[in-house]
Amino acid sequence: MDEYSFRIANRIVGNHKKAPGIEITLSGPKLLFHHDVVVAITGGKAEVDVNGNPVDQWAPIFIKAGDKLSIGKLSTGCRAYLAIRGGIDVTEYLGSRSTFALGNLGGYNGRVLKLGDVLFLGQPELPSCTLPSAVSEPTKIPESLIPSYDFNANKSWKVGVTCGPHGSPDFFKPESVDEFFSAKWKIHYNSNRFGVRLIGPKPQWARKDGGEAGLHPSNAHDYVYSLGAINFTGDEPVILTCDGPSLGGFVCEAVVAEAEMWKIGQVKPGDTIQFVPLSFEDAKSLKSKQDSLVESLQGELPSIETKALPKPENPVLGEVQVSPNAPKVVYRQAGDRYILVEYGENVLDLNLSYRIHKLIEMVKDNKTKGIVEMSQGVRSVLVEFDSEVTQKQLLQTLISYEKEIVFENKWKVPSRVIKLPMAFEDEKTLAAVKRYSETIRAEAPWLPNNVDFIASINGVDRSDVKNMMYTARFLVLGLGDVFLGAPCAVPLDPRHRLLGTKYNPSRTYTPNGTVGIGGNYMCIYTMESPGGYQLVGRTVPIWDKLSLGSHSVNPWLLSPFDQVEFYPASEAEVDECSERMNAGKFKVEIVDSVFDHGAYLKWVQEHSASIEEFQKNQGGEKLEEFNRLIQISNAELATNGGVKLGEDEKFSDDAELVYSEYSGRFWKPLVAVGDEVKQGQGLIVVEAMKTEMVVNATRGGKVVKIFHDNGDMVDAGDLVVVIE
């Protein structure tokens, strides 16, 4: 999350830049070493000692076998980093040694570290070791390289961003963009490696809805997100970070500059952020200077204060106008290392998917310099590039390729028909909806039942929604929605495209294998994760983590242009099939085929009368009514913190008022009113950033009052317990 601090930690101990280390959130571990090693601890300030003797951060620490290293609570910042000379020897998975805890992948058994875990260090002399050797001797660094982490609600972090990919006047009103940069955004307690949620002014939208993509103006046809994108999930902004989603259907107003992402890794609940608009050139310059600092260990961190643009930039870098043989193409700035290439108007058109397919093929065939990766969305492709090419050069190259693509209407691509079992509205699916209503938002148009909402807004019966799920064939247009190869797929029959909207705010939990509908699209969730689609049922896992299945050349099951069908199954059958799938024993029914767009257009034409009738009847007054409800019912329902003592609440003169040190959700009390407690004893648990933190008694006595109920919001400084 704070790449700068992690890189400096590796430099201090002399490690290769790819050596794995440990990221520590809010409170650190105690470690017993069995070998002589050199370590370094960077990031936020914490109490650090070896065998009870204090040691310095941001400097080499020489450890002997048998020594115990203790890292306490962070007093500034949110994260600290521990680098050990030689690195930590964990297996590489999909090109990384990082832990993706949400997906139970990578790192140490795919999870956070626990009491009793044994970590093995890199030993390059052993043939089995795949870690790179240390590259330099341990060294001290000048204080000028150590950032300040002393920020809070009254002293805002200044974070540099580039504008776009979505801006004004097409998505946000101009005054809303101005407010975005002038506002001080508070960090929400529910922030983590997935994303940093922000609390601030509601955006002023320049459009009433997302068209075919959904009923909320934040909805977009699914596209691939940039790392660091500030993503509006409904009216709620989230900064997408290391473990964030790959592809989704919400607009992004700005992207945090790559050199500024370390700050996002250090903000904690209750802190405030003010965004600073930067030019693309200044954002790249900041990254270049930061890399130079890490390599040379000389100089000081550059300031962004003098680099602020007088007004936000237009994120549109260029356009190719529509012609008889080609759609309109818009090239949008999507950070300082991405360009989002967007095709056509805001409608679903399979020709656009084929055009994206041809562009990706051209880049591969020409081995285009500087392009790192191309990631396909519904009507767009995200192009990641490196320092081998400038933004301007890449833009010119992409435009020149576009002119070479020949328009075709009768195209064919290889396709597989994949048939999966699905239990409609199983208990786990319904429990996820109920959990949302109990913990995030009690009332919304899609509550208490998502299927009822879909049926009502489309003027059909709930049985029609069920029949659609079992008779439709869904064409995969993008992957990674939200994670791990989850498909964004569209029903091929236009009569199966049901209007809807996504959750606002999004869910924090969706079961693995859940099937959702959002706007025109279907998604299968490939892990327990946040999400926004309306939930209708559950199928088998389609991410094969261990690649045990005969179908699994790669962990992901689906590819663009695959076609997915569901067949009815009971909840017990889906559970059994899921167990067999995870063990590599479930045989997925796969038929190799070809998607013939010419034949598809002919079929659509043959059924045009019934398709037009369906589209005419879809929505109407019901759609207008639901649109109205969504417009007036978009505020997240949450309990305010900041308990005030009422006039009738009198305590003795020697009463001890205990305040929370943390911002988060009141998780549970550890004591009850009337209990006798000792100084230092745990009183309550506050949950934030996937971490449980205990507020301890500041003195001994009797508990006479506990403020808040389970699930309430608590801010740092809020009164939580009274002891007499």
What are these regions (language model features)?
Residues 164, 199-201, 520, 661-663, ...:
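A structural micro-motif recognizing beta-strand termini
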Residues 1-648, 716:
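Conserved "landmark" site that anchors the functional core of diverse proteins
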Residues 55, 63, 113, 267, ...:
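Hydrophobic beta-strand core residues of beta-sandwich domains
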